[in-house]
A protein has these predicted regions:
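HIT superfamily nucleotide-processing domains
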Residues: 1-168
Length: 168
C-alpha cells in the first residue's frame, strides 16, 4: 500500500467508473432498477439512505431530491427541513446502532473527496474503541453488518415513529 494513501477496496470498482451512467443519487430518487435503493426515508425534499460503501454500520447519506452540488444552493425551507430530518435520523440511529458519537459532514467537489457530484450529507455512527476515521478508510476494521440489513432495521424503526417536521 502506498504511504499516505487509504484504500477502500469495496468502492474501487465504483471509483474506477464501473457505475451506471448519470447521477446515481438522482437514479435512487427516481427508483431506477439499475441502482440499489437503500433509502430509509423519502419525502418531497430529501432522501436518507444507508451508504452502499459504509465506514460503519448505520452510515447514512442524506441528499436533496433536487440535484444540487453546493450547500449554498439550499433554500431556507430545505435548510429548516434538513435540520429537523437530521434530528429525527439521529434518533433512528441511536435506537438501531447505539453509537457513542457521530461524524457528520459534506464533501463538496472532487478535491474534497466527493465521488458523487449530487450534494449529500454523511451521518456516520462512531464507537469507543475506534481510533479514527482513518482506520475505517484504510480497511483495518471489519464491518459487522451488511448495508441491506442496516436499511431493513432502520426502516422498521422509522415505521414506528414516522418523520414529521412538526414533531421534531
Amino acid at each position: 500500500m502506498a504511504d499516505g494513501y487509504f484504500f477502500s477496496f469495496d468502492k474501487l470498482s465504483y471509483v474506477q467508473g464501473k457505475r451506471p451512467a448519470g447521477c446515481i443519487l438522482c437514479m435512487v430518487r427516481d427508483r431506477s432498477p439499475d441502482v440499489v435503493d437503500l433509502s430509509v426515508h423519502r419525502d418531497g425534499l430529501f432522501i436518507a439512505a444507508v451508504n452502499l460503501y459504509p465506514y460503519n454500520p448505520g452510515h447514512l447519506m442524506v441528499f436533496p431530491c433536487r440535484h444540487l452540488e453546493d450547500v449554498r444552493e439550499y433554500t431556507a425551507e430545505e435548510e429548516r427541513h434538513l435540520c429537523a430530518l437530521q434530528r429525527w435520523l439521529f434518533g433512528l440511529l441511536d435506537k438501531a446502532c447505539s453509537p457513542h458519537g457521530y461524524n457528520v459532514g459534506y464533501n463538496m467537489g472532487a478535491a474534497a473527496g466527493a465521488s458523487i457530484e449530487h450534494l449529500h450529507l454523511h451521518m456516520i455512527p462512531r464507537y469507543p474503541r475506534e481510533t479514527g476515521i482513518a482506520d475505517l478508510i484504510a480497511g483495518r476494521r471489519v464491518l459487522v453488518e451488511d448495508p441491506q440489513e442496516t436499511a431493513r432495521r432502520l426502516r422498521a424503526i422509522a415505521a414506528q415513529a414516522p418523520f414529521s417536521i412538526s414533531s421534531t
